[in-house]
A protein has these predicted regions:
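Divalent metal-coordination and catalytic microenvironments
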Residues: 6, 36, 47, 64, ...
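Active-site-proximal loop/helix segment associated with metal-binding centers of metalloenzymes
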Residues: 16-18, 129-199
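Conserved beta-strand hairpin/beta-sheet module of binuclear metal-dependent hydrolase folds
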Residues: 2-50, 154-172, 189
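Cap/insert and terminal regions of metallo-dependent hydrolase folds
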Residues: 175-266, 271
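Active-site neighborhood of phospho(di)ester-bond hydrolases with catalytic His/Asp-centered motifs
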Residues: 35-38, 57-65, 98, 168-172, ...
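Active-site metal-binding motif and surrounding structural segment of the metallo-beta-lactamase
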Residues: 41-94
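Short histidine/acidic/glycine/proline-rich micro-motifs that form metal-
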Residues: 14, 67, 95, 101-102, ...
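Metallo-beta-lactamase
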Residues: 89-154, 251, 259, 263
């Protein structure tokens, strides 16, 4: 059986200081997909600490253009361009995203990187615009992008599928919209934001910020008939208790497996028959 690993490079919300911003890798059959890159060059440290060399990354997916998701991608691209010029990065970095996020990314790169680097956009770094429902291949994964129908910022989640039937769905970092049900229902793995505990909703005001709680995510997972729930994009005021308290709140509403990973924690993505 092919080993598949989800590694959370960061698990925090936009202004977290105790965690890095939410971003992760999916490694499968020798191929690595980087999903978002956080808000700065800490992404380089996180990749290094997770044992992911930059020259192993040839695919990146960006959900949206908020600073805590896209600015780290500038650093990834800059380093790939530099390594390519030095002859230590082979091949191409393929970056997938919707029109808005790719436009923002390219503009920042062309405004802030030297011409010797930005000139490599279109050769060493290829930007691939995806629309709602488009699919593309990353190694042995088929990735389908979908619009999460955010009312705040255009954002795409995705559904990854393997030939053995394993499915992993990323809902982005905003509350679930019923329009995305065809992509999320019956997934083996569901990645959902949980800004805080429902018990702490008065303290953190998640709903006013277009976010949800651990209890909300768990109820959603149960209603969508998923098997495994991964919570991320959280507040950072409870690092010593987060795993236990978020897991307990989610478990009270969802009978499947609940994961509340720390930064740099890896989770093995098993196929349905190995759950």
């Amino acid at each position: 059986m092919t080993k598949r690993t989800l590694t959370m490079l960061g698990t925090g919300y936009a202004t977290a200081t105790r965690y890095y911003n939410t971003c992760f890798t999916i490694k499968s059959d020798g191929t690595t997909l980087l999903v978002d890159a956080g808000g700065g060059n800490t992404i380089l440290n996180r990749l290094e600490e997770s044992g992911t060399p930059l020259d192993d990354i040839h695919y990146m997916y960006l959900t949206h253009a908020h600073t805590d998701h896209v600015l780290g991608a500038v650093w990834v691209m800059r380093m790939v361009m530099q390594m390519s010029r030095n002859g230590v990065y082979g091949g191409v970095l393929h970056v997938y995203g919707h029109d808005k996020v790719l436009s923002v990314l390219e503009w920042i790169c062309r405004q802030t990187l030297s011409t010797k680097f930005s000139a490599l956009i279109g050769s060493v770094v290829m930007l691939h615009e995806v629309e709602d429902g488009d699919s593309f291949s990353v190694g042995d994964m088929t990735v389908t992008a979908f619009d999460i129908h955010s009312t705040r910022e255009k954002q795409f989640g995705f559904r990854a599928r393997w030939s053995d039937g394993t499915t992993l769905v990323c809902l982005g970092d905003e509350p679930y919209n019923e329009a995305t049900k065809p992509y999320a229902e019956n997934a083996q793995w569901l990645l959902s934001e949980a800004f805080c505990l429902y018990a702490d909703r008065e303290k953190f005001k998640p709903y006013e910020k277009h976010h949800s709680t651990a209890r909300d995510a768990a109820r959603l997972a149960a209603s969508l008939n998923v098997q495994n729930l991964v919570l991320y994009h959280t507040e950072d005021k409870s690092p010593d208790t987060r795993k236990a308290t978020y897991t307990a709140e989610a478990k009270s509403e969802f009978s499947g497996n609940v994961f509340v990973p720390d930064d740099l924690e890896s989770i093995e993505i098993n196929s349905p028959k190995h759950q």
